[in-house]
A protein has these predicted regions:
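Carboxylate-rich, polar loop motifs that coordinate divalent cations or form catalytic acidic clusters
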Residues: 1-188
Length: 188
């Protein structure tokens, strides 16, 4: 049985497990039964928060979990979660993760609600996050819902109130797509 009926994401990993992100825990279905992962305040290797927003497995087999207060990586060998700390110069940390992608070049890009876009260069060890301040300043919003890379390696960024953007990380070109006057808003 699922931990909650409010589902934010469903994801199948390369081993065939179905993962379900809910607003009250993370569920893993092995084809027969569900395992439920929840936050445990006395266990630093438990799920960081029960409100799980997004799930993603990268090309190296790392399984990422985005919660409303940070990013974790799941360790299959130990069945534990490890937090990756993301800090900004202004002292803010533990962003609300809304979307995670891997670009064709192997870099991870992370959309957040409140702290803009974050990138993680492929093979950076230890994990070195780059807050994409210039990009979010140009967009005019730190509230990003979804990030997607197209076949031309452009990033498409859907915001909560500023519409849709196409961004080329290489050329830094940014194109805005706003709602026509007869649509109620630019929440994408």
């Amino acid at each position: 049985e699922l931990s909650n009926s409010l589902i934010n994401a469903v994801y199948q990993d390369r081993k065939g497990f179905i993962w379900i992100a809910t607003e009250n825990g993370l569920n893993k279905f092995d084809g027969t039964r569900f395992s439920i992962y929840r936050h445990n305040a006395t266990d630093s290797t438990s799920l960081k928060n029960n409100y799980v927003r997004t799930l993603f497995e990268d090309s190296r087999g790392n399984f990422w979990i985005g919660c409303i207060n940070g990013l974790q990586r799941y360790d299959r060998a130990t069945d534990n979660f490890h937090e990756l700390f993301i800090s900004r110069k202004d002292g803010r940390k533990n962003p609300h993760i809304t979307s995670i992608i891997e670009r064709r070049n192997g870099d991870l890009w992370i959309a957040t609600s409140g702290q803009g876009a974050i990138s993680l260069k492929k093979n950076s060890n230890p994990a070195s996050f780059h807050i994409e301040t210039e990009l979010t300043d140009r967009i005019g919003s730190n509230y990003l819902n979804v990030i997607f890379e197209d076949s031309r390696q452009n990033l498409w960024i859907a915001t909560e109130e500023k519409g849709l953007y196409r961004y080329s990380p290489e050329s830094k070109e940014l194109k805005s797509y706003k709602a026509p006057y007869h649509i109620a808003g630019d929440d994408v």
